[in-house]
Amino acid sequence: MIDPDGFRPNVGIVLMRQDGQVFWARRVRRDGWQFPQGGMNTDETPVEAMYRELREETGLLPEHVELLGATPGWLRYRLPSRAVRRNERQVCIGQKQVWFLLRFTGDESHLKLDHTDTPEFDHWRWVDFWYPVEHVVMFKRGVYARALRHLAPIAQNLAGPAAVGAMPERALEAWLPGSSAAGHDSPRKRPRKRSGARPMRINND
């Protein structure tokens, strides 16, 4: 299912403990780490897709989590050109996502990465709330930053401002929200500092 602009509907999952740490997993046979995410089926709502992906990728059931909130509307990112399959009938140039924040209420024994015959992840750990922004694959950093900025106030209400904190300045400097008709994030060069210059403002979209 790809929209007219070439973006595939998708859901992303931020699974958080009471202390503000989030679930971070390594992809099978790859060095990359990321949040659970996956494409939506044509007959699914975003919430239905989220619970299905949660079960497939982590083994967790709805009773093991509490849905705290979600990003409003779609957040988009483009795939790198090398990952775009131009010979397909419908060309997918990226993902448009709804991101969900879940509180983990179960036991770690409920986490089963091999729940399906084709697992997505082979290892997991808990990390600080903002850690993924700087450590996910480069082309996803913009959308991770936007998603976590939307969800941070909800996370702070649960874990407390000290546990979640603010997005690190180095992450904001490395990735600034891009602007385009498609609404995706684009990497920008780090601005040079000038004496007496005012700090660059970041739009909270």
Swiss-Prot record:
According to the UniProt record, what class of enzyme is this? Answer: hydrolase
Q: Report which superkingdom the organism of origin falls in.
A: Bacteria
Nudix hydrolase domain: residues covered = 6-149
Required cofactor(s): a divalent metal cation
The biased composition feature labelled Basic residues covers 187-196
Q: Which GO terms describe its molecular function?
A: pyrophosphatase activity
Ordered alphabetically, the record's keywords are: Hydrolase
Q: Where is this region: Disordered?
A: 177-205
The record places the motif (Nudix box) at 38-59
Tell me its EC number(s), please: 3.6.1.-
- NCBIfam families attached here? PRK00714.1-4, PRK00714.1-5
Q: Which family does it belong to?
A: Belongs to the Nudix hydrolase family. RppH subfamily.
Its function?
Answer: Accelerates the degradation of transcripts by removing pyrophosphate from the 5'-end of triphosphorylated RNA, leading to a more labile monophosphorylated state that can stimulate subsequent ribonuclease cleavage.
Q: What PANTHER family does the record tag this protein with?
A: ADP-RIBOSE PYROPHOSPHATASE, DIHYDRONEOPTERIN TRIPHOSPHATE DIPHOSPHATASE
UniProt protein name: RNA pyrophosphohydrolase
Q: Which species is listed as the source?
A: Xanthomonas oryzae pv. oryzae (strain KACC10331 / KXO85)
